[in-house]
A protein has these predicted regions:
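Extracellular/virion structural assembly segments
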Residues: 34, 52-94, 140, 153-155, ...
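Short, charged, low-hydrophobicity "junction" segments
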Residues: 38-54, 66, 104, 309-310
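Short beta-strand and beta-hairpin "edge-sheet" elements
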Residues: 52-53, 98-133, 210-212, 340-370
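Oligomerization/assembly interface segments of phage tail-like spikes and tubes
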Residues: 60-81, 117, 127-138, 257, ...
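Charged- and aromatic-enriched interaction segments used to assemble
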Residues: 123-248
Length: 379
């Protein structure tokens, strides 16, 4: 869940973040005035602030390699993207997007991401600029390995991942948890996708990795249904529409993780199984034995294999009760959030869900949609 930020000379400026967040929750629950803005960065430094955004959307999907992208319409006749040094062109410029509410003296807004511009165009009549951009993982992905890159055996995984990113796309801020896992000898050949390898390394120790609303590179444990919920979708509150879908396709009840590292002298494997007797997708006769195999050269110990298997199982556990909801726009929400869903007519009573996909509109009339997944269907 993203934290909101206060801009301008308003009463909330000296308040702690939890008070600002509470004020924001109260405001968006009633009629309010939309506030959006775009800042432009070059070489990780803000060079222009407060550019007017007239429409567009931000789309995020935790199952995609590049998690977030945006399409934005900007009304600023003095900044039309034509020449290479115009700041809305795809020559290294980035958009930092915000959405929130206007209040007396300023705005309270949440950061939606920092997006390197990929494509820009301008309408010659209206002078409206259209921008397409992707989050900063695109910059890492573009920086393929031009030569062989090697990580020494025994390197801490967090250290190795940060160095791997810095080698191709320097200057980012990293928010990584501590880990005791260390790497085997790892060699990456020319033209391999740097970001894809970073994600595989993070996944091998049970983590997800992405760029957050402020453009920081974040690594954290995969979300699970034991996590404390940070929000809700509820009738009579923020739910505008909902469709429920049940699909066993992406569901697995066992994950077997093995090492494919050729430097190991003996096979290394680990697993995680849905053994919960109350689970309708329990590994066994009723649901069936539906296992998924995962192999990675980054796995070198049984503990690491078990950790990776548990993280993958947590994201694929049980028949997914998938809910496609239209909700009151809340820019604090982000994919991987654990939330509750309440809709009495559908038998949903504060059921835990993980946000898998979401689209957030940037215009005053544009809504917010979210696809959320429950752990399992109650028996």
């Amino acid at each position: 869940m993203r934290e909101v930020v206060a801009f301008g000379d308003i009463d909330y400026m000296n308040a702690v973040s939890v008070e600002i967040d509470a004020a924001f929750s109260r405001i968006i629950a009633t009629s309010h005035q939309l506030a959006t803005r775009a800042d432009v960065l070059l070489d990780r430094v803000v060079i222009a602030e407060g550019i007017k955004v007239t429409g567009g959307q931000v789309t995020s999907d935790r199952d995609q390699s590049i998690q977030s992208s945006c399409s934005v319409t900007i009304s600023d006749p003095l900044r039309v993207p034509v020449a290479a040094d115009d700041i809305l062109t795809p020559y290294g410029y980035e958009l930092r997007l915000w959405r929130g509410v206007a209040v007396a003296g300023g705005q309270i807004m949440a950061p939606l991401g920092v997006f390197p511009i990929q494509r820009s165009s301008v309408d010659g009549v209206t002078l409206l600029s259209s921008i397409t951009a992707q989050d900063r993982s695109k910059t890492v992905s573009d920086a393929i390995f031009e030569d062989t890159y090697q990580i020494a055996a025994g390197t801490n995984y967090a250290t190795a991942i940060e160095a791997l990113i810095e080698d191709g796309a320097p200057g980012f801020t990293f928010l990584f948890p501590s880990t005791t896992f260390t790497t085997p000898i790892l060699t990456f050949g020319p033209d391999e996708n740097r970001w894809a390898e970073v994600q595989r390394m993070a996944r091998s120790i049970g983590n997800e990795i992405f760029f957050d609303g402020l453009g920081r590179c974040v690594m954290r444990p995969e979300p699970t249904f034991t996590s404390e919920p940070v929000g809700e979708i509820a009738e009579g509150s923020n739910m505008l529409g909902v469709v429920v879908d049940l699909d066993r396709g992406p569901a697995f009840n066992k994950v077997i993780a093995t090492s494919s590292n050729s430097s190991l002298t003996a096979p290394v494997t680990g697993s995680a199984t849905d053994n919960d007797p109350s689970s309708p997708s329990q590994y066994g006769p009723r649901f069936g034995r539906k296992a998924r195999r995962f192999s990675s050269p980054f796995l070198t110990t049984v503990a690491q294999c078990n950790s990776a298997a548990a993280a993958i199982l947590a994201s694929n556990l049980g028949v997914a009760r998938c809910i496609n909801a239209t909700i009151v726009t809340d820019p604090r929400r982000e994919v991987s959030d654990v939330i509750t869903v309440k809709r009495e007519a559908l038998g949903l009573d504060n059921e835990l869900h993980i946000v898998d996909r979401m689209t957030l509109g940037l215009g005053a009339t544009e809504s917010m949609t979210a696809t959320v997944r429950a752990q399992q269907v109650p028996s």
